UniProtKB/Swiss-Prot annotation:
Its main location: cytoplasm. This is Glutamate--tRNA ligase 2. It comes from Wolinella succinogenes (strain ATCC 29543 / DSM 1740 / CCUG 13145 / JCM 31913 / LMG 7466 / NCTC 11488 / FDC 602W). The gene is gltX2. It catalyses: tRNA(Glu) + L-glutamate + ATP = L-glutamyl-tRNA(Glu) + AMP + diphosphate. Belongs to the class-I aminoacyl-tRNA synthetase family. Glutamate--tRNA ligase type 1 subfamily. Keywords: Aminoacyl-tRNA synthetase, ATP-binding, Cytoplasm, Ligase, Nucleotide-binding, Protein biosynthesis. A motif ('HIGH' region) lies at residues 6-16. Catalyzes the attachment of glutamate to tRNA(Glu) in a two-step reaction: glutamate is first activated by ATP to form Glu-AMP and then transferred to the acceptor end of tRNA(Glu). It holds the Pfam family Anticodon_2. One of its GO terms (cellular component) is cytosol. A motif ('KMSKS' region) lies at residues 231-235. One of its GO terms (biological process) is glutamyl-tRNA aminoacylation. It comes from the Bacteria. The lineage of its organism: Bacteria, Pseudomonadati, Campylobacterota, Epsilonproteobacteria, Campylobacterales.
Length: 438
């Protein structure tokens, strides 16, 4: 089983979505189940409704989970495992106060030494009124694991000192709950961000402590950088999946980009289902990947081209596929839904006769309306339409073409008129409307 384990403490980060996608792909490739585990153990930071938002996003991106679990539901099992570790002498109660540990950290800092917890401190401040934490004893030997991206990763015993697995309030820490749940659900392969590399030896130590001998596979994804080459943070708009969607980027384009960046792929534009056929986690680069919004814009435009006219019309809140055809004509100048919508809205909005070609618009308008109301046969062919409109209005050349474009689109520039005509003719009664300035 592979798992995606988000915390409901904020908006989904693009790095988290990338990890979800990779886990989903690997589950499909390996014929294993895809588990979504909501890690809701941090009660103070949990935000109501964020779990539903996460699940909704996974659905939107086409990732259907086989199992769903809330980590807090497993608290009884976590407590049981902690008691077992205590009974075996592999864990112990620690009464150190925050103030005591902060002092020890300052002392280590003053000596320019890394802070390490010493087991001998455990009962220095023992008090009958003080609730202890539970710590797992640190490593006694080197801990190594193979990372499918980074290669062999090792930690010396002094790098994994005794650490807290259960807090004073009885709530398990992240590492403890994570390690036990991975064991309970028989997770076989863990793909996550490289900020979790230092958690891996602790989780391995926990599993060894309870007698779990299965060797898990790991792949830690390099961090994402912003366009300035710095680590992407919440201050970067593109770090939020919600922001990308609100800006009008398609889920399939976002997924395409997150798979593509820092990776060797046989093609540049693809769907998630296509990536399942050839994806190889070992081809992901070790180096951090820079988020390039221009590249995402390009991919978004390419995925618009892949959509049927009906599907694109639906995204633009229209039912007629011809609206999707109109929208595709604007892909040379538009890359997102937010850029396409104003173009389509302008087509269907009443036009205002103003500027250099205002008089030509006012002259041409009644003749076009007459052709519409008379169901002129010329409305079926652009050349015939152009010829009849010129004859009726007496306009020709630039005044004719500019005023016609303005009456159709509200803009002096845009796609070829002959291309626009093929789709716009079905909506001439709604499109060719003139509102004189008040």
């Amino acid at each position: 089983m592979l798992r995606f384990a988000p915390s409901p403490t904020g908006d989904m980060h693009t790095g988290n979505l990338r990890a979800a996608i990779f886990n989903y792909i690997l589950a499909k490739q390996r014929g294993e189940k895809f588990l979504v585990r909501i890690e809701d153990t941090d009660m103070e930071r949990n935000i109501e409704g964020k779990d539903k938002e996460i699940l909704s996003l996974l659905n939107l991106f086409g990732m259907v989970w086989d199992e769903l679990v809330y980590q807090s539901h497993n608290f009884p099992r976590h407590a049981q495992m902690a008691e077992y570790l205590l009974s075996q002498g592999r864990a112990f109660y620690c009464y150190c106060s925050k103030e005591f540990l902060d002092q020890k950290r300052e002392e280590a800092l003053a000596q320019k030494l890394p802070f390490r917890y010493h087991d001998a401190w455990a009962e220095i401040e023992k008090d009958s009124t003080q609730k202890p934490v539970i710590r797992l004893r640190g490593a006694s030997e080197e801990i190594c694991f193979k990372d499918e991206i980074k290669g062999i990763v090792s930690f010396k015993p002094h790098e994994v000192d005794s650490f807290v697995i259960v807090r004073e309030d009885g709530i398990p820490t992240y590492n403890f709950a994570c390690a036990i749940d991975d064991m309970l659900y028989d997770v076989s392969f863990i793909v996550r961000g490289e900020d979790h590399v230092s958690n891996t030896p602790k989780q391995m130590l926990i599993q060894r402590g309870v007698g779990y001998e299965k060797l898990l596979q790991y792949a830690h994804l390099p961090i994402l950088l912003n366009e300035e080459g710095k680590k992407m943070s919440k201050r970067d708009n593109a770090s939020s999946v919600k922001w990308l969607l609100e800006e009008g980027y398609l889920p399939q384009a976002i997924a395409n980009y997150l798979i593509l960046m820092g990776n060797k792929t046989p093609t540049e534009v693809f769907a998630l289902k296509e990536a399942i056929e050839w994806f190889d986690i070992t081809h992901v680069a070790k180096a951090p990947a820079k988020f390039d919004l221009d590249k995402l814009r390009f991919l978004n435009r390419e995925h618009f081209k892949r959509l049927s006219e009906q599907d694109l019309a639906f995204l633009l809140d229209h039912k007629d596929p011809s609206v999707g055809g109109l929208a595709k004509l604007y892909l040379q100048e538009s890359s997102t839904l937010n850029e396409l919508r104003p173009k389509i809205d302008a087509l269907f909005a009443p036009k205002i006769a103003q500027g250099e070609f205002a008089s030509a618009m006012i002259l041409l308008y009644p003749h076009l309306r007459a052709m519409i109301e008379e169901f002129s046969p010329a409305l079926k062919d652009f050349e015939a339409f152009k010829k009849e409109a010129m004859e009726r209005s007496g306009l020709k050349g630039k005044p004719f073409f500019k005023s016609l474009r303005l009456l159709l689109t509200g803009s002096e520039n845009g796609p070829e008129l002959s291309d626009l005509f093929e789709y716009a003719r079905f909506f001439f009664n709604d499109i060719i409307r003139l509102k004189e300035p008040s």
